[in-house]
Amino acid sequence: VAEGLPMTISAQTDPHQHPHSSANPPPIAPELAALDKKLGKLVVNRFTYRLLRLLGRFVRPPFDPAGVSLEYDHSGGERIAIITPETRRGDGALILFHGGGFVFGRPEDIFPKAAMFAKALGVPVICPAYRLAPQAPFPAALNDGHAAWHRVLARAEALGIDPAKIVIGGYSAGGGLAANLVHRLHDEGGPQPAAQLLIYPMLDDRTAQRRDLDTPRHSIWSNANNRFAWPAYLGGKRDAQALPYAAAARRADLSGLPPAWVGVGSCDLFLDEVRDYAARLAEAGVAVSYEEVAGGIHAFDMDANPLASAFTALQVDFTRYHVA
């Protein structure tokens, strides 16, 4: 591992050494009360997911294009949005996948984040669209992410990107997609991502099967939502055990993967699976930077707040090291 790479993994990644877990979350941080009140009771099921998709077409986070340019690539498959900073300071790039439980969401949802990364890092940020379940179950999203990776490689010279300096990341389901894409690229050989940025990633279908997670309140993404999303993504399959690259936590051998930044809030439904995955990466010899935010709910960084600012700053620092 190159000198200077952040290699911090907290003892909190061991569920047995920490008082809080997905089944026993701490109080929500006071700074997140407004966000929790606004979106905490989000319901995602077979009736609402279509409405969420429709709303996503018309209600988007405010995107300020100052300091960046936006280009869409429709050359093949799903569209890819490329956000390039006016001032380039590196020849790497960040591929960033949106969230939405694999059943809703659009690249435009993360444009504000992508623009922030582009300006902070001085490199292009690529936001690929991917097909959504249940209409397009696994492996559709993975295949779209895989195609996006190769489309970026094909355009790397024209975009001023060094193929050896591309970080793959994502939020929630997009983080799970990023982790699975990293697995697939590792197994296929060929050009590899420089690092992976896993932001409260959706990694383990077995979480949805845990009935002990039905009682605790998990803001924004509940296990009821999870219990709809995973079967939808898996195409009605009972679990992901026999589906390689569907649920990243199912992978037995994590050795040889690129350095990872992994972050989650301590009130997130995904806490146990994310904490365990980070610990397993470290045990497999992968350089891991793990951040667990006390009182953080799922997607707590979607609104401006002090916890989000600190959380995002760590992501920028990690990514900068690999794209500079």
PLM regions: where:
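A glycine/proline-hinged amphipathic helix-loop "lid/cap" segment
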Residues: 2-86, 306
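Short amphipathic alpha-helix adjacent to the substrate-entry channel of hydrolases
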Residues: 108-126
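Hydrolase active-site cap/lid region
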Residues: 183-240
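Catalytic histidine-centered segment of alpha/beta-hydrolase-like enzymes
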Residues: 296-307
